[in-house]
């Protein structure tokens, strides 16, 4: 069993990772990012391009260890063309070809635009990027993103920053059943228990930002999420018991009654 766990890798395109916990960085102070990464034992961290501006005095890239894989996002893009421009700038800054596609034109609810995201997947894949689209958990859109070149699908669990948990659980389960790509739950996860629940479903990884950034002790909460993600993954591999009616866990006959 230990050997199976050792060989249990998160595979995204040509990349492999031991950790299935992806850390967001959009709400941390720069000074806290390194300690959060260390406690999370994360190997991937997302970042917005605006925080990696090499012309600024404070550059987030200076606070991220060199052995951590960067997952820049296209935050701020309102359509596919804008997402492509941001991705190109990210690559010029040396952030690599992995890219999380975020296309959001709705400023009130901050919901991803699945239609423009599909277009962005195709554009970025043609230019050699490894796109990971952030999207609504919609089967038809997920199929289109897969066909357009997505390396993984990142459905939201609940509205971004809401900490409401697995509101889209049933729809995420459909993606797990039907899409042969890594499914990475992104947005809305508010507690370690919710992250564990997502991993028990069989998702490939969980990405968390707000729930850690708003904790009283950021580093300790990052550790809690890391443990929860690992526990959920091990539980999934072990085979979580199905829900049923009351059933005795010990024999009721053959002792006092005989």
Curated annotation (Swiss-Prot):
Molecular-function GO terms, alphabetical: thiazole synthase activity
Cell compartments where the protein resides: Cytoplasm
Signal sequence interval, chain numbering: none
Major site of localization recorded for this protein: cytoplasm
Reaction it catalyzes: [ThiS sulfur-carrier protein]-C-terminal-Gly-aminoethanethioate + 2-iminoacetate + 1-deoxy-D-xylulose 5-phosphate = [ThiS sulfur-carrier protein]-C-terminal Gly-Gly + 2-[(2R,5Z)-2-carboxy-4-methylthiazol-5(2H)-ylidene]ethyl phosphate + 2 H2O + H(+)
Protein's pathway: Cofactor biosynthesis; thiamine diphosphate biosynthesis
GO CC field: cytoplasm
Keywords: Cytoplasm, Schiff base, Thiamine biosynthesis, Transferase
Single biological process term from Gene Ontology: thiamine diphosphate biosynthetic process
A Pfam cross-reference name: ThiG
Residues that coordinate or bind 1-deoxy-D-xylulose 5-phosphate: 161, 187-188, 209-210
EC code(s) of this entry: 2.8.1.10
Catalytic residue list: 100
Subunit structure of this chain's protein: Homotetramer. Forms heterodimers with either ThiH or ThiS.
Role according to the record: Catalyzes the rearrangement of 1-deoxy-D-xylulose 5-phosphate (DXP) to produce the thiazole phosphate moiety of thiamine. Sulfur is provided by the thiocarboxylate moiety of the carrier protein ThiS. In vitro, sulfur can be provided by H(2)S.
Similarity section: Belongs to the ThiG family.
Record-given protein name: Thiazole synthase
Source organism: Campylobacter jejuni subsp. jejuni serotype O:2 (strain ATCC 700819 / NCTC 11168)
This protein's encoding gene: thiG
């Amino acid at each position: 069993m230990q050997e199976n766990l050792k060989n249990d890798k998160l595979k995204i395109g040509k990349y492999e990772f031991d950790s299935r916990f992806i850390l967001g960085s959009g709400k941390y102070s720069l000074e806290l990012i390194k300690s959060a990464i260390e406690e999370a034992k994360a190997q991937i961290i997302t970042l917005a391009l605006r925080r990696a501006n090499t012309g600024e005095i404070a550059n987030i890239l200076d606070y991220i260890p060199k052995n951590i894989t960067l997952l820049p996002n296209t935050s701020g893009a309102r359509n596919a063309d804008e997402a492509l421009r941001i991705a190109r700038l990210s690559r010029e800054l040396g952030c690599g070809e992995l890219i999380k596609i975020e296309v959001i034109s709705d400023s009130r609810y901050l919901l991803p635009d699945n239609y423009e995201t599909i277009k962005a997947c195709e554009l970025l894949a043609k230019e050699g990027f490894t796109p990971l689209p952030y999207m609504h958990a919609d089967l038809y859109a997920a199929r289109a993103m897969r066909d357009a070149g997505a390396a993984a699908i990142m459905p939201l669990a609940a509205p971004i920053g809401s900490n409401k948990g697995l509101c889209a659980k049933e729809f995420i389960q459909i993606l797990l059943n039907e899409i042969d790509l890594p499914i990475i739950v992104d947005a809305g996860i508010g507690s370690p228990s919710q992250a564990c629940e997502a991993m028990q479903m069989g998702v490939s990884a969980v990405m968390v930002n707000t729930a850690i950034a708003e904790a009283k002790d950021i580093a300790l909460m990052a550790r809690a999420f890391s443990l929860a993600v690992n526990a959920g993954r091990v539980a999934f591999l072990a085979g979580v018991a199905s829900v049923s009616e009351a059933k005795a866990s010990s024999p009721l006959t053959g002792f006092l009654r005989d």
